[in-house]
UniProtKB/Swiss-Prot annotation:
This is Probable septum site-determining protein MinC. The gene is minC. Keywords: Cell cycle, Cell division, Septation. Cell division inhibitor that blocks the formation of polar Z ring septums. Rapidly oscillates between the poles of the cell to destabilize FtsZ filaments that have formed before they mature into polar Z rings. Prevents FtsZ polymerization. One of its GO terms (biological process) is cell morphogenesis. Belongs to the MinC family. It comes from the Bacteria. It comes from Lysinibacillus sphaericus (strain C3-41). The keyword Chaperone does not apply. Pfam families: MinC_C, MinC_N_1. Interacts with MinD and FtsZ.
Amino acid sequence: MKKQLVNMKGTKDGFVLRLDDQCAYSDLVEELKKKVLEGGIDGKVDVQLYLGYRYCTDEQIDELIHIVQETEQLIVASVQSEVLTVHESNQKMIESQQDTYLGVVRSGQILRSSGDIIIVGNVNPNGRVEAGGNVYVLGKLKGIVHAGVQGNKEAIIAASQFEATHIMIADQVEAMSDEHVKEINQAEMTCAFIGYDGRITYDQIHALKNIRPLLNVSKGGS
């Protein structure tokens, strides 16, 4: 039985077109053309192209999108790949680096790191910390923190005492009121992260093992 090189699966948001990542590119193109011409679709539908571990040039991706959208019913909403571009790979390497700062981040001071940063000390009101990765404050966090400044939505902010005025993770921003600080300021170290709903949420630090399991692996924890 001939192996299917293109599989189409329906989802609540439209369709996912899974493209074989082992076959010759020319064979994939031919089967994709046949698949999208099968018809049976009413109206316009969003499609996600999933390339798996196949590396495609920009020109090849444009060609695949063009083939799918020739039908007019199918609209490519996104292209997903497990292959990192050089830029993405470099960015991950930068974000995996870790800096340690011993001391107080004072009012008006800005502390920056391209990767993770561990602060052993307090972040005073109007002190600011910016990091490409995660921010850990082993002390009182009373200033402003931006984790994942390059858009890393997996970044977290953790502090022994969480009293920040503003926190940002990737493109999400939250101003914290006194009431909010009282609600989240547990006896244990508190962390902030982007939850499943796309909003900043809070939990105790021990919950990170379930919330960000890869964080535990990447830092060599147990």
